[in-house]
């Protein structure tokens, strides 16, 4: 059996398979189905400074090869996470990632500060959140806006910092370079693509917010290309994601240069997918005589 362990900066993962934020809660429900401590890591449900009820109306809509969501970051807030979810989350024998979002720069800073002394291994900063002081445009669209967020957060935390990039950014490679320049320990990509669906019977958008995030197999080829481009242009490690539903998808992302991979939408299709991907990577390595993932990472 090959060695699945990977080093992401200063953090060691037992294997490269991470459950993506917003698709795995804080792990409790899935732990009733299988031993989630076999996973490499879990990225928590997206946390905001204050508790959020989420969006009204339709939140999830199935597409031909994936799904759209407009959940609206429903979450217990950072303090709620610390009080009610962290006692379970912190005891897991895997890499514990806190995904943090915000509506203002101050929200990001206060949220991360509250987690600084908590048993968290990585902060994953979600810069796809709308900036309420800039007309709702996401922080992760323009490089210089993202630069300020990354710089300020980097200045107030010593925890490993990973920036989750939006595929809707004006220049995703440039965005990754900005994150590296401002001291991020890594980047994760891609988040969901801005998309739309229309209810033709009622002649209105399916979602109250009109647009929603597209994920699932439909986005994989584009996500893979973006991960490959970023990996070729930065010297910090990358967590690759976007449409991964099986072990061969994960292996493609690793061959494109990703150190780790994240699995999101596939959790809704098959709640055991994380374990199946780990087993599939193991089988591939045995079949191909691969001793370490370093042998195939970034070979494309």
UniProtKB/Swiss-Prot annotation:
Any GO CC annotation of this UniProt entry: cytoplasm
GO MF annotation list: dihydroorotate dehydrogenase (NAD+) activity
InterPro entries linked: Aldolase_TIM, DHO_dehydrogenase, DHOD_1B, Dihydroorotate_DH_1, Dihydroorotate_DH_1_2, Dihydroorotate_DH_cat, Dihydroorotate_DH_I
Comment on bound cofactor: Binds 1 FMN per subunit.
Active site (catalytic residues): 129 (nucleophile)
Keywords annotated in UniProt: Cytoplasm, Flavoprotein, FMN, NAD, Oxidoreductase, Pyrimidine biosynthesis
Keyword NAD: yes
Cellular location(s): Cytoplasm
Chief localisation class: cytoplasm
UniProt catalytic activity: (S)-dihydroorotate + NAD(+) = orotate + NADH + H(+)
Presence of the UniProt keyword Ligase in the record: no
Positions bound to substrate: 45, 69-73, 126, 191-192
Binding site for FMN: 21, 45-46, 99, 126, 164, 190, 216, 242-243, 264-265
Functional pathway: Pyrimidine metabolism; UMP biosynthesis via de novo pathway; orotate from (S)-dihydroorotate (NAD(+) route): step 1/1
Top-rank lineage group of the source organism: Bacteria
CC cofactor: FMN
Protein family: Belongs to the dihydroorotate dehydrogenase family. Type 1 subfamily.
UniProt function note: Catalyzes the conversion of dihydroorotate to orotate with NAD(+) as electron acceptor.
Subunit structure: Heterotetramer of 2 PyrK and 2 PyrD type B subunits.
Protein name: Dihydroorotate dehydrogenase B (NAD(+)), catalytic subunit
Species per Swiss-Prot/TrEMBL record: Clostridioides difficile (strain 630) (Peptoclostridium difficile)
């Amino acid at each position: 059996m090959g060695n699945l362990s990977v080093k992401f900066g200063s953090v060691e993962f037992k294997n490269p398979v991470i459950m993506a934020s917003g698709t795995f809660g804080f792990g409790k429900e899935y732990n009733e189905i299988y031993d989630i401590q076999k996973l490499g890591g879990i990225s928590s449900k997206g946390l905001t400074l204050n508790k959020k009820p989420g969006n009204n109306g339709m939140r999830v809509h199935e597409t031909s090869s994936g799904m759209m969501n407009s959940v609206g970051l429903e979450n217990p807030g950072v303090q709620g996470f610390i009080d009610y979810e962290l006692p379970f989350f912190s005891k897991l024998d895997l890499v514990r990632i806190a995904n943090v979002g915000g509506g203002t720069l101050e929200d990001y800073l206060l949220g991360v500060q509250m987690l600084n002394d908590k048993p968290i291994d990585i902060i994953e900063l979600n810069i796809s959140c709308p900036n309420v002081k800039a007309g709702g445009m996401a922080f992760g669209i323009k490089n210089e806006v993202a630069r300020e967020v990354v710089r300020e957060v980097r200045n107030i935390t010593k925890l490993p910092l990973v920036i989750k990039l939006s595929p809707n950014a004006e220049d995703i490679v440039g965005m990754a370079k900005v994150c590296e320049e401002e001291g991020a320990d890594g980047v994760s990509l891609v988040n969901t693509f801005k998309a739309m669906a229309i209810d033709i019977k009622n002649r209105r958008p399916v979602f109250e917010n009109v647009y929603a995030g597209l994920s699932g197999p439909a986005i994989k080829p584009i996500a893979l290309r973006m991960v490959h481009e970023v990996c070729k242009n930065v010297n910090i490690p990358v967590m690759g994601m976007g449409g991964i539903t099986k072990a061969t998808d994960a292996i493609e992302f690793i061959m494109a240069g990703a150190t780790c991979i994240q699995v999101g939408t596939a959790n809704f299709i098959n709640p055991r997918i994380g374990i199946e991907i780990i087993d599939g990577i193991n089988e591939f390595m045995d079949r191909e005589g691969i001793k370490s993932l370093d042998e195939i990472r970034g070979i494309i």
